[in-house]
């Protein structure tokens, strides 16, 4: 490992801060969880956000160090369109950072940073410059004391560049930055000057001193616990240490670019190779975390990244878009771009990454080729500086699925301006058309109604974890999307209660069913007011009980007894707990990077969707079943706990992508090795599940597999049914149950032998029943109609019959009321008259089919068979006259 390589700098940084009392934290996932404001982790401080806002420690640690995987492509942090055109922009990058949560502050942070850049990175003090916030005299004085710099080397910056805030309100504070001067031969001026945007002075490290909290009035109030948040981009740090101004000239990127040049050629097209090098890293890391290309959210960002790389590969070589062939430079140990030492998930998921990149590239190339041809037509006559009309880009996007970013890239390469307003207009009109043609079901109005009711009554209090029935008050009744005061027998309505034992559908688990019985209110003549709860769903944090009133009347304000269907709930609990165990087993025994992509917990089965590149083998399925059942039989207690989201994730709990979690309190469900954030209902002990059986495994999308399974009594019932079937088969075969397999093999072998004999008999019938017609040039025609002989037997006959080089065979049979005519022509005869030519002669008889010179197949009406054979006879005798 070179002392200046990316790997060595990462290693030095982490070891330096661990040695100086910091707790080492592994990188959090790129796919940000528990933070609705982020698509991806875009900064080193993101995993510690709650510690900064609360001033609390992280797992008891007051200091931390990490090398955080980051992605800026999509959402408010988006560098995608700049990648390839600048020296420093990336979609994926690593952020080195050290953090303090109420422990040390400015002086210690500055001292550690200075020691690292001068002693560990070995940067010359003469090349370093410092910036501080203009009002932060304290930081200025500390830097002056530690570095000995003159005042003009510590620059005061008055803009927001040197004052960081988490948002309009909340923690904030001044920043201080370390800059590196590449020297006079590079264009640019020092920070704060009019030439500061040039590459000569490069920001290496940013130190944020979080010491204030800005309130809603804009006032800055001192924080009780001052914090430190620092960030140093690893790629930029490597460029400085290696003495290059361009991140793409560092060791890792040079290796990836060389590999791209080997795969696609055109070494002079630096932009294309830079894009491929950057995007292959970003895509590989996202796929390793279980993401797959799609049309929404994070999945769409991944799709855009891959397709942009494919587009540049196409630019380099239109016949080759195999971007997956670049991947090994990152995953093969010993290669110059190897990242598997720091991120072993790349190596573990190499097959999945390769498969996803290949499939997405192959699936997109036709769209790309078609879109490029259409775009070339539109822009072929445009000169640099002219405008590419937005409606053209919209047509490509809307009609042909051609990504807008690729259109923008091409416009930029040609020096064209882009009519963004025209594109936006097309998008707006499309959305208006969609709204106009959409036939609604009152969902918007219904949603507003539930929001109003939630504002009035607050969230439903759910007590279903601890009890199966409770007394409650009817807060609201809705029928046909409108609030009503009462509902009568025979009507359907939704009842809203103040407290409910009914679990509302969420997290993949189906909602409860049961009954609501009136306790107070108007009694009917039979004395009982009863509502059957047919389903429970959630809207605006309210539990909506969908009911059919079976007797009596219900009024707003009534007191009721609410009771769930306990047997159904028990089956749901078993299936939900089994789903957690299945997820854990898949991650432990199949692939540690498997993640849930969807699930269904029903009363009669469970369904689990997960990322995996290939179908599970029979051996893998058997292993999964065996391990899940082993964990069930271990009868471990199922434990629940409530803690902060950050504490749960740090404690190893799995958070599911796409789910929204509170930062302050989440529910953690643990059973043995499984620990997940989950609000569903579960068994008390794993043994309560009873048993587990996989009933199917299939693929539902690119890189996504689905397992369906049953548990408990369903497994027992299934085994009993299978046993009955097995017993019936053994009785029919006349063998003991233990010998059924051998009996079936014997039966199948006998069947095959009989079929062979039958085929031979059919062939003899054909040969003995057709009369040869001798034509000229030694050609012999054989025609016949055998309505009871199967097509496959005739096809088999043709294989041997066509060995007669001057033979022509036309043999018909009947299938499902239609005639099928098989025509075979020997090699010598086919040079004059082929089988496919004979098919054409039957067009007047509505003969439909085709083939080649040696073999063809035609379908026609049974009544036309004899005329078809006569037509063939006439054609053959004309072609080969005697």
UniProtKB/Swiss-Prot annotation:
Q: GO MF annotations for this entry?
A: alanine-tRNA ligase activity; aminoacyl-tRNA deacylase activity; ATP binding; tRNA binding; zinc ion binding
Q: What are its GO biological-process terms?
A: alanyl-tRNA aminoacylation; negative regulation of DNA-templated transcription
What keywords would UniProt list here?
Aminoacyl-tRNA synthetase, ATP-binding, Cytoplasm, Ligase, Metal-binding, Nucleotide-binding, Protein biosynthesis, RNA-binding, tRNA-binding, Zinc
Q: Please give an example of a GO cellular component term from this record.
A: cytosol
Q: Where does Zn(2+) bind?
A: 576, 580, 678, 682
Q: Establish whether keyword NAD is in the entry.
A: no
Chief location = cytoplasm
Q: Does the keyword Zinc apply?
A: yes
Name one matching Pfam family: tRNA_SAD
SMART domains from the UniProt entry: tRNA_SAD
Tell me, what does this protein do in biology? Catalyzes the attachment of alanine to tRNA(Ala) in a two-step reaction: alanine is first activated by ATP to form Ala-AMP and then transferred to the acceptor end of tRNA(Ala). Also edits incorrectly charged Ser-tRNA(Ala) and Gly-tRNA(Ala) via its editing domain.
Per the similarity annotation, which family is this?
A: Belongs to the class-II aminoacyl-tRNA synthetase family.
The record's note on its domains = Consists of three domains; the N-terminal catalytic domain, the editing domain and the C-terminal C-Ala domain. The editing domain removes incorrectly charged amino acids, while the C-Ala domain, along with tRNA(Ala), serves as a bridge to cooperatively bring together the editing and aminoacylation centers thus stimulating deacylation of misacylated tRNAs.
Q: What is this protein called?
A: Alanine--tRNA ligase
Give the organism the record lists: Anaplasma marginale (strain St. Maries)
Quote the gene name from the UniProt entry. Answer: alaS
């Amino acid at each position: 490992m070179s002392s200046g390589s990316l790997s060595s700098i990462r290693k030095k940084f982490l070891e330096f801060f661990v040695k100086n009392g910091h707790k080492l934290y592994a990188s959090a996932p790129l796919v940000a969880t528990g933070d609705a404001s982020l698509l991806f982790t875009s900064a080193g401080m993101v995993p510690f956000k709650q510690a900064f806002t609360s001033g609390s420690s992280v797992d008891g640690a007051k200091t931390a160090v990490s090398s955080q995987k980051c992605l800026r492509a999509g959402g408010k942090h988006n560098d995608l369109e700049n990648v390839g055109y600048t020296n420093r922009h990336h979609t994926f990058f690593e952020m080195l950072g050290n953090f303090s949560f109420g422990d040390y502050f400015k002086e210690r942070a500055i001292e550690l940073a200075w020691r690292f850049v001068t002693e560990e990175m070995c940067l010359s003090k003469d090349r370093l410059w410092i910036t501080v916030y203009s009002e932060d005299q304290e930081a200025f004085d500390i830097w002056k004391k530690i570095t000995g710099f003159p005042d003009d080397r510590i620059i005061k910056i008055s803009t927001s560049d040197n004052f960081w805030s988490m948002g309009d309100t909340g923690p904030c504070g001044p920043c201080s930055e370390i800059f590196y001067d590449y020297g006079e031969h590079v264009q640019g001026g020092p920070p704060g000057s009019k030439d500061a945007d040039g590459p000569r002075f490069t920001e290496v490290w940013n130190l944020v001193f979080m010491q204030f909290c800005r309130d809603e009035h804009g006032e800055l109030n001192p924080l009780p616990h001052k914090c430190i948040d620092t960030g140093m981009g690893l790629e930029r740090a490597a460029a400085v240490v290696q003495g290059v101004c361009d991140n793409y000239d560092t060791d890792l990127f040079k290796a990836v670019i060389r590999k791209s040049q080997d795969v696609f050629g055109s070494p002079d097209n630096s932009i294309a190779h830079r894009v491929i090098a950057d995007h292959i890293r970003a895509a590989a890391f996202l796929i390793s975390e279980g993401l797959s290309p799609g049309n929404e959210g994070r999945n769409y960002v991944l799709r855009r990244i891959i397709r942009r790389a494919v587009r540049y590969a196409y630019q380099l070589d239109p016949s080759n878009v195999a971007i997956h062939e670049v991947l090994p430079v990152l995953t093969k140990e010993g290669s110059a771009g190897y990242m598997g030492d720091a991120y072993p998930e790349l190596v573990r998921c190499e097959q999945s990454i390769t498969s996803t990149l290949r499939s997405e590239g192959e699936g997109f190339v036709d769209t790309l080729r078609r879109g490029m041809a259409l775009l070339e037509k539109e822009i072929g006559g445009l000169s640099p500086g002219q405008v590419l009309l937005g409606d053209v880009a919209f047509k490509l996007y809307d009609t042909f699925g051609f990504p807008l970013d690729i259109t923008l890239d091409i416009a930029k390469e040609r020096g064209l301006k882009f009519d963004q307003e025209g594109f936006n207009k097309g998008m707006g009109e499309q959305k208006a058309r969609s709204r106009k043609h959409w036939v609604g079901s009152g969902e918007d109005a219904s949603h507003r109604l539930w929001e109003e009711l939630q504002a009035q009554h607050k969230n439903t209090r759910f007590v279903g974890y601890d009890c199966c029935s409770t007394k409650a008050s009817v807060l609201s009744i809705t029928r046909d999307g409108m609030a009503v005061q009462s509902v009568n027998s025979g009507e359907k309505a939704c009842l809203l209660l103040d407290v409910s034992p009914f679990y509302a559908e969420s997290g993949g688990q189906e909602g409860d069913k049961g009954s609501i019985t009136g306790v107070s209110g108007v009694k009917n003549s039979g004395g009982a007011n009863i509502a059957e709860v047919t389903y429970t769903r959630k809207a605006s944090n309210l539990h909506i009980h969908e009911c059919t009133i079976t007797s009596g009347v219900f009024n707003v304000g009534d007191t009721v007894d609410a009771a769930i269907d306990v047997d159904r709930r028990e089956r749901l609990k078993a299936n939900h707990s089994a789903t957690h165990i299945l997820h854990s087993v898949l991650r432990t025994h199949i692939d540690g990077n498997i993640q849930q992509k969807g699930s269904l917990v029903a009363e009669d089965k469970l369904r689990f969707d997960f990322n995996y590149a290939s179908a599970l083998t029979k051996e893998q399925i058997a292993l999964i079943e065996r391990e899940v059942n082993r964990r069930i039989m271990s009868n471990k207690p199922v434990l629940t706990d409530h803690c902060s989201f950050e504490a749960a994730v740090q404690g190893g709990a799995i958070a599911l992508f796409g789910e929204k979690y509170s930062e302050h309190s989440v529910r953690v469900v643990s059973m043995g090795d499984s620990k997940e954030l989950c609000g569903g209902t579960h068994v008390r002990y794993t043994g309560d599940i009873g048993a587990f059986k996989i009933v199917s495994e299939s693929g539902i999308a690119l890189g996504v597999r689905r397992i369906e399974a049953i548990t408990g009594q369903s497994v027992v019932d299934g085994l009993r049914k299978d046993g009955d079937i097995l017993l019936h088969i053994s009785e029919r075969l006349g063998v003991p149950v233990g010998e059924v397999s051998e009996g079936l093999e014997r039966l199948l072998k006998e069947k095959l032998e009989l079929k062979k004999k039958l085929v031979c008999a059919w062939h003899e019938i054909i040969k003995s029943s057709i009369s040869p017609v001798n034509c000229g040039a030694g050609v012999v025609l054989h025609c016949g109609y055998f309505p009871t002989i199967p097509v496959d037997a005739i096809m088999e006959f043709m294989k041997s019959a066509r060995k007669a080089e001057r033979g022509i065979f036309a043999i018909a049979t009947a299938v499902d009321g239609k005639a099928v005519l098989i025509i075979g022509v020997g090699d010598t005869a086919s040079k004059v008259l082929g089988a496919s030519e004979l098919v054409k002669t039957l067009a007047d008889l509505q003969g439909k089919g085709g083939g080649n010179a040696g073999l063809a197949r035609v379908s026609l009406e049974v009544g036309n068979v004899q005329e078809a054979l006569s037509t063939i006879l006439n054609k053959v005798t004309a072609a080969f006259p005697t």
